[in-house]
Swiss-Prot record:
EC number: 4.2.1.19
GO molecular function terms attached to this record: imidazoleglycerol-phosphate dehydratase activity
Entry's family note: Belongs to the imidazoleglycerol-phosphate dehydratase family.
Species the sequence originates in: Solidesulfovibrio magneticus (strain ATCC 700980 / DSM 13731 / RS-1) (Desulfovibrio magneticus)
EC class (word): lyase
Swiss-Prot/TrEMBL catalytic activity: D-erythro-1-(imidazol-4-yl)glycerol 3-phosphate = 3-(imidazol-4-yl)-2-oxopropyl phosphate + H2O
Name of the protein in question: Imidazoleglycerol-phosphate dehydratase
Gene Ontology annotations of biological process type: L-histidine biosynthetic process
Location relative to the cell: Cytoplasm
Pathway note: Amino-acid biosynthesis; L-histidine biosynthesis; L-histidine from 5-phospho-alpha-D-ribose 1-diphosphate: step 6/9
Keyword terms: Amino-acid biosynthesis, Cytoplasm, Histidine biosynthesis, Lyase
GO cellular component: cytoplasm
Amino acid sequence: MAKRFGAYSRETGETRVAVEITIDGKGNAAIDTGFGFADHMLNLLAFWAGFDLNLTCRGDLEVDAHHTLEDVAICLGEAFRQALGERVGIERVGDARVPMDEALCDVVVDLSGRPYLVYREDVLPPVIAGEEKDLWREFFKSLAISARMNLHIHFVYGQNGHHLVEAAFKALGLALRRATAAHGSSRVPSTKGSLD
């Protein structure tokens, strides 16, 4: 199988983002968004997925982290989709259930080409790492749309916002590792013969 690599960059009046991703990597990451908690989460995602990820962002953090995280998710999704290519010979679907101390999160992905987010967040506290909890919904929504994946995230239980979000990123990494696993087939994993 050819190297599954993608790169994407974007510059707006709010952010400047550059991403390089190798799906069949070793889980090495170099992340610098200017928002330390996001860097930590993205490092976890890369590690648990087994992706090599280089990502930089300069955003208007003096306003808040919204533009930064939204644009990071858009660019990450675009680079990931590029790396996947035609999605021939992959498992396509992956899931994971991950605890983090008192918190538990379930994540299921389908690399179907049809973007959708289901996000059950009832237990999330209103503020996580100094930002409103809705910031993470926007991140995952933007990622699902740009990567063209069906993404279900269920925060099952927990109290600590850091632990809950960390469990989600670890579970997403594991689910993506499983969904992108290559099994040697020359077929697209769909009865209709294409994923779009």
